Amino acid sequence: MKSSLKLFFLLFLAAGSFTAFAASYTDGIEYFKAGQPDRAKILLERTLNDAGTNKAESYYYLGEIAFINKDYTAAAEYYKKGLEADPLFAYNLIGQGKLALNGSADKEQTEKVAEKYFKEALKGKNKKDAGLNLAIAKAYYETGTPGYEEYMKKSYKADKKFPDYFMFEGDVLVNQQQYGDACGRYENAIYFDPNCIEAYVKYSHIYFDINPTLAIQKLEELQTIAPNSAIAQREMAEAYYKNSQYTKAAEAYEKYMQNPNHFQTDRPRLATLLFYGKRFDESLELAKDILSHDPQNFVI
């Protein structure tokens, strides 16, 4: 009976098939918006061909990740595929414009090319779209091209309660090492959209080294808002672990590992936490399974 329970536990973790959680490409977007592009890429690629995936949106974020990694050829291909999937998803046009701004040719000429993409993206009703104007502002900012403030103003005018606007303001302040003011902007984002997952995550990251209790409280608040979010679950587990709350960390990791969008690379952490919690049999069974797939795992 004991062995059967161990086996059930192991299969439960490995497959995630006994869970009510549903895999979704939006988990990848949440990781990207929270500043974790590498994890975002894994999930966006994993869910790309799922029935519920908006491919145009997924390709856009894959393009953004490639841009961050300075793989501009891949970024161009992703934006192109995004437009092929849905020509009306204008963010991919903005991605192409950002690539133009990043060109090494004459700056004046590259700006003219970029402006054509941006003008096309803002045609018709899109002209007053807060998200599209903000994406253009980011394109200017991320390429070091003057002019991002103009599109920030347009974004704010279109929607004064747009949470992504405040998130970007916060990110700019972080780059300027104005962390207190940045947290204020993240709080604004939460105020206008309590479901703004990335705001909770970024806020907690800033505060953890200063006030881990406050950071953990913010993530616990997030659990009530988005209990099925993969990043919310993982961040909660990691925060407990970093704060040496190993029993809570193990429980949080067990919940997270039931999510189809968990990462197999997190399983050694759970095995360690089970050991710390004196759940030796479960820890051993999980460790054996990990080693059967990864004999060189240095943690195990």
Predicted regions and their residues:
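N-terminal leader/linker segments that initiate helical-solenoid repeat arrays
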Residues: 18-80, 84-95, 101-112, 119, ...
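Register position in tetratricopeptide repeats
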Residues: 33-34, 68, 95, 102-104, ...
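Structural marker of alpha-solenoid helical repeat scaffolds
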Residues: 50-51, 85, 123-125, 157-158, ...
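Residue-level recognition of tetratricopeptide repeat
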Residues: 54-55, 89, 128-129, 162, ...
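TPR alpha-solenoid repeat register
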Residues: 58, 92, 130-132, 165, ...
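Canonical tetratricopeptide repeat
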Residues: 60-61, 95-96, 131-135, 168, ...
